[in-house]
Design a protein with these regions (language model features):
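Short, thiol/selenol-centered motifs that function as redox-active sites or metal-ligating centers
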Residues: 52, 56-68
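Alpha-helix C-capping/helix-to-loop hinge sites
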Residues: 37-41, 55, 90-93
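Iron-sulfur (Fe-S) cluster-binding segments and ferredoxin-like electron-carrier domains
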Residues: 29, 68-82, 106
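C-terminal structural segments of small proteins and small subunits
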Residues: 84-109
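Amphipathic alpha-helical segments within well-ordered protein domains
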Residues: 35-36, 53, 70-74, 88
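Alpha-helical scaffolds flanking conserved acidic
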Residues: 46-51, 80-86
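Acidic, glycine/proline-rich low-complexity segments that act as flexible tails and inter-domain linkers
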Residues: 1-48, 101-122
């Protein structure tokens, strides 16, 4: 059983973007131009771009992005194995980012010395 009716959700997202486009056409037009410009590059094919988009989508926790880019990745011929590998990279990088930020937390803790400063003090 699926967590969500992704096809219906993708249609709902498209309808929502259509509504935003009516209210702020330049914003949506700018987004569309940015997306179109990216699609014109020749360094990566559509499948790789869509797998990258999905890796970013899970990092940003964007269900709409997942719905749209999963459909596009499938159209571009992505396999479940390729999807797993791309998402594995995102999982690894996100875990790595948490690890790096953990070092900043320890730095903050140590920099405060024996006793934390009072509120409003540095």
């Amino acid at each position: 059983m699926s967590m969500l009716d992704w096809n219906t959700y993708r249609k709902q997202v498209a309808a929502g973007v259509g509504e935003i486009s009516k209210l702020s056409p330049d914003t949506v037009r700018g987004y569309a131009q940015l997306s179109a410009a990216n699609a014109k590059t020749t360094h990566f094919d559509a499948k790789i771009r869509e797998l990258m988009a999905l890796a970013v989508a899970i990092s940003l926790r964007c269900d709409g992005c997942i719905a749209v880019h999963t459909a596009e990745a499938k159209k571009a011929g992505a396999t479940e194995g390729e999807l797993a590998e791309a998402l594995g990279v995102a999982i690894s990088v996100n875990a790595g980012a948490a690890l790096v930020y953990a070092t900043r937390t320890f730095d903050s803790f140590k920099a405060m010395g024996e006793k934390a400063p009072e509120a409003g003090q540095s």
